[in-house]
Amino acid sequence: MELLRIAVLFAFTAVAEIVGCYLPWLVLRQGKPFWLLLPAAASLALFAWLLTLHPAAAGRTYAAYGGVYIAVALVWLRLVDGVALTRWDVGGAAIALTGMAVIALQPQAN
């Protein structure tokens, strides 16, 4: 259950980060309206706050989060960008998520 809680929180965190970076990309690369920078800033602030909800040390949290970020970014690639995933994408995400689980579920020192 702990792994599920961590993964869901990381997934929300990743979506907040991706939205916060994707909206400025739309403004700068596709000429979308500048007002999109406001929700982008709010999304990045949400991203930073969500990272603080994890009890682990910041560096460990960021390291474990990276695995989930990779998987969520690939889901974004498929659903938002409409790009089909390759077996290499799926395999890489599986490896990254395994790494996240190893880091996030390590025994706690007393």
UniProtKB/Swiss-Prot annotation:
Its main location: membrane. Belongs to the UPF0060 family. Keywords: Cell inner membrane, Cell membrane, Membrane, Transmembrane, Transmembrane helix. It is a multi-pass membrane protein. It comes from the Bacteria. One of its GO terms (cellular component) is plasma membrane. The chain crosses the membrane at residues 8-28, 33-53, 65-85, 88-108. SUPFAM superfamilies: Multidrug resistance efflux transporter EmrE. The lineage of its organism: Bacteria, Pseudomonadati, Pseudomonadota, Betaproteobacteria, Burkholderiales. This is UPF0060 membrane protein Rpic_4131. It is found in: Cell inner membrane.
